[in-house]
């Protein structure tokens, strides 16, 4: 298998692993979403550090640590990045317990479109015709949701509007993805320990002995998903990597409807159809750009 084939396989594996989280979270009763978030942070650290060693990223991690010592502004920005991604982690752990995975998937469907607008507003990137049409379709879906419910789910808005500032900050930091992720998880550790010690249910391991292996498994699942995601990002052209990233919200939506029993009615369809069309248009546009770039390299 060539590098592109391995990259595609890793991207699909990453999306499938992330889509397993909602079902996995439901097995962690009696823990609530915040406790599951805290436990995920704690158990992710040994798994991520092991992944760093096995992937040969130890030297890169040390160089990033030295850079933090030399650049105080970077050291100040890293806790902000950790806070931004921590909110997303907490939401991802809480949503399955509240039965709002469909709303979360909509946020991830909207995210690429918000990123297109972010590039236009903050980086002066021009919208190509298909991108502009995609944004218009997405706005049509949003307008229908507002007309239907007179509101918009905050669960949808948090990933759609919360990730762009995080990505912008990470772009400014120019830090290796493995290093940045490792530092972010380590910075979340004090909060996680405080949440577990202060609010964790007493004798939870006695009441639910399966947590002895399910919680470490949560950390392993997080590390494997992240490792596959980062591996695919290094092996694939950015355009193809972006197109394949749309698989995750599709799988989340399917899991919510087919396995978690969340309802999806005809009225909601008219919110999702324009947004799905927008995602297809963005995918076509990215595919065209990828094809043009590949022809230039021939």
Would you name each region that the model predicts?
Residues 94, 110-130, 250-269:
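C-terminal transmembrane-helix exit sites in multi-pass transporters
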Residues 1-13, 46-80, 129, 181, ...:
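Membrane-interface interhelical linkers
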Residues 41, 149-152, 246, 250-298:
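C-terminal-most transmembrane helix of multi-pass membrane proteins
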Residues 9, 105-110, 177-187, 223-258:
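Helix-helix packing/entry segments at the starts of transmembrane helices
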């Amino acid at each position: 298998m060539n590098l592109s084939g391995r990259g595609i396989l890793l991207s699909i594996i990453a999306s499938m692993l992330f889509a397993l989280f909602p079902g996995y979270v439901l097995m962690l009763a009696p823990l609530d979403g915040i406790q599951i978030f805290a436990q995920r942070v704690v158990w992710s650290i040994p798994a991520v550090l092991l992944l760093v060693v096995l992937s040969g990223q130890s030297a890169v991690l040390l160089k990033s640590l030295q850079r933090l010592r030399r650049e105080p502004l970077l050291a100040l920005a890293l806790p902000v990045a950790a806070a931004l991604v921590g909110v997303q982690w907490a939401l991802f752990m809480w949503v399955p317990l509240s039965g709002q995975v469909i709303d979360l998937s909509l946020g991830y469907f909207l995210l690429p479109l918000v990123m297109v607008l972010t590039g236009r507003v903050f980086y002066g990137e021009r919208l190509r015709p298909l991108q502009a049409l995609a944004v218009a379709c997405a706005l049509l879906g949003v307008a229908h949701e507002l007309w239907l419910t007179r509101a918009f789910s905050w669960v949808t808005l948090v990933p759609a509007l919360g990730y762009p500032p995080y990505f912008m900050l990470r772009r400014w930091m120019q830090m290796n993805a493995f290093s940045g992720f490792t530092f972010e998880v380590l910075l979340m550790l004090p909060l996680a320990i405080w949440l577990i010690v202060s609010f964790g249910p007493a004798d939870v391991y006695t009441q639910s002995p399966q947590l002895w292996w399910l919680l470490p498994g949560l950390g392993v699942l997080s590390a494997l998903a992240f490792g596959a995601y980062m591996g695919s990002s290094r092996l694939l052209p950015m355009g193809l990597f972006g197109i394949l990233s749309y698989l995750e919200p599709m799988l989340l939506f399917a899991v919510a409807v087919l396995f978690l029993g969340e309802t999806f009615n005809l009225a909601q369809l008219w919110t999702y159809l324009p947004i799905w069309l927008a995602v297809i248009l963005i995918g076509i546009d990215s595919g065209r750009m990828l094809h043009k770039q590949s022809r230039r390299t021939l």
